[in-house]
């Protein structure tokens, strides 16, 4: 009977939201995006915080649906490889590269990335370079006590 109660308690705890062990890359990451100037378009650098939970990364900057919004999302494999998706809304036309330089347009692209326990690097996939331009991502994991101090 005691084993049955312990077994039942385990499944109740699991059903109540037990998530299992944390992912290898879980934590708070300082994220920097640098997009090179291209074809008369200005370059830029953005800084924001991304969070990894269960080896799934999410970071964003700005207000969803508004100009200059950027979100990056994706799963990091156990070997540190990740194909992340960056999506957002274009900013001023002076920073928007490609044939359609309209402000306020939705966009998305992939970021091929590699993570270690403490850092990561990624590159925007640019295809033939007609629409995309080189963008470089760096990720630096915050120490656990630094993440707690910066909610």
What is each stretch, according to the model?
Residues 12-15, 36-38:
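Amphipathic alpha-helical interaction segments
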Residues 4-13:
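Sec-dependent N-terminal signal peptides
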Residues 16-20:
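Boundary at the C-terminal end of the N-terminal hydrophobic targeting segment
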Residues 22-116, 121-151:
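Central antiparallel beta-sheet cores of small beta-barrel/beta-sandwich binding domains
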């Amino acid at each position: 009977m005691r084993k049955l109660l312990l077994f039942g308690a385990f499944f109740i705890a699991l059903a109540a939201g037990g998530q299992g062990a944390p992912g290898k890359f879980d934590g708070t990451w300082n994220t920097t995006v640098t997009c090179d100037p291209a074809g008369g378009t200005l370059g830029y650098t953005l800084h924001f915080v991304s969070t990894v939970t269960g080896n799934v990364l999410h970071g964003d900057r700005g207000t969803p649906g508004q100009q200059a919004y950027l979100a990056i999302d994706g799963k990091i494999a156990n070997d540190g490889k990740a194909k992340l998706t960056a999506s957002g809304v274009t900013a001023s036309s002076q920073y928007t590269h490609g044939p359609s330089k309209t402000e306020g347009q939705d966009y998305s692209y992939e970021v091929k990335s590699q993570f270690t326990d403490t850092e990561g690097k990624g590159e925007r996939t640019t295809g033939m370079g007609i629409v995309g331009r080189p963008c470089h991502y760096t990720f630096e994991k915050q120490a656990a006590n630094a993440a707690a101090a910066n909610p």
